[in-house]
Regions:
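Hydrophobic alpha-helical membrane-insertion segments, chiefly the h-region
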Residues: 19-28
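C-terminal domain-boundary segment and adjacent tail
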Residues: 40-48, 76-78, 89-91, 222-273
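Active-site beta->alpha N-cap acidic-glycine motif
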Residues: 33-126, 131-147, 236
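Catalytic domains of cell-wall/extracellular-matrix polysaccharide-remodeling enzymes
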Residues: 114-216, 220-238, 242-243, 249, ...
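N-terminal Sec-pathway targeting helices
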Residues: 1-18
Length: 273
């Protein structure tokens, strides 16, 4: 009698476990199809809640003119940043990308061409651009199993440009092992003929009242002396008590288990340094 009751209890417990596991898996799978589920911004803010933390990010490079000057400033202040690179620019300047990597900076994917009408035309074209950029990065770094895991949408995910198409693309990111991140403060350094002072004032305005800063800058052209505004920005934030961190630091603690899962799913090796 005791054996029968015990056996029934085990069966019931097993059924409960299966139901809970199946329900949790369904909820997780459903959430993974939502754009917000792969938005790293919320998680960065949550991790550093109550701290004054700044993340420097640079889009559209690498370039032979601006990137080395940006790297010189970062090295002088001992700051690691994130560079969201274009595959086309990587193909043109592989040596500069290698210098970024050797300097300890984190490399993110920004697509291949920065042509929104092509990048966001359909899900397959979107994935193809990201994977093409990854291959360019692998070739430049000579690391065959290098995998990016962080993407930044050209023009930003939250901008109204191609909004519905970007929603579709964002839902596809988890299937190729990616999350994305936008920004919450800018210098507008890519706007032509904007003075250094004006650019710095824009940064102060857009960063006001924020503890966690994801700062957007560019290392693609030499329009507005990005490296000068960068130095102004760094000094200003240091005086305000901010600590500079790299998104790779977040990647280390948050994505390690995702990398293992993704690697198993792909049946191959996933690289991270």
């Amino acid at each position: 009698m005791f054996f029968v009751i015990k056996q029934k209890s085990i069966i019931i417990i097993g059924l409960i476990f299966i139901i809970v596991f199946t329900t949790s898996f369904f909820i997780f799978s459903f959430a993974a199809n939502e754009p917000e589920s792969c938005d790293l911004m919320h998680e960065v803010k949550e991790k550093y809640r109550g701290e004054k933390v700044a993340f420097l990010t640079f889009d559209d490079g690498p370039s032979k003119i601006v990137t080395p000057k940006v790297l010189e400033v970062l090295e002088r202040y001992d700051i690691e940043a994130t560079f969201f690179v274009l595959g086309k620019a990587v193909d043109e300047n592989p040596d500069v990308l290698k210098t970024i990597y050797d300097g300890g900076h984190f490399i993110g994917n920004h697509g291949y061409s920065h042509k929104a009408n092509k990048l966001y035309s359909c899900e397959s074209a979107f994935k193809e651009e990201l994977q093409k950029t990854e291959e360019s990065i692998r070739q430049a770094l000579q690391i065959p199993d290098f995998n990016c895991t962080l993407f930044r949408f050209p023009n930003g995910f939250t901008s109204p440009i191609y909004k519905s198409q970007k929603n579709i693309c964002a839902k596809a990111l988890p299937s190729i092992g990616y999350k994305y991140i936008d920004w919450n403060s800018v210098t507008n350094d890519s706007v032509q003929k904007l003075s250094r002072e004006s650019s710095f004032n824009i940064f102060k305005k857009t960063s006001k009242g924020k503890d966690v800063l994801i700062i957007l800058m560019h290392d693609s052209g030499d329009l507005n002396k990005t490296y000068d505004v960068l130095e102004d920005t760094i000094n200003y934030l240091l005086e305000k008590g901010y600590e500079f961190k790299s998104l790779e630091e977040f990647f280390d603690w948050h994505f390690s288990y995702l990398l293992v899962l993704y690697s198993c799913k792909q049946g191959g090796k996933t690289w991270k340094r």
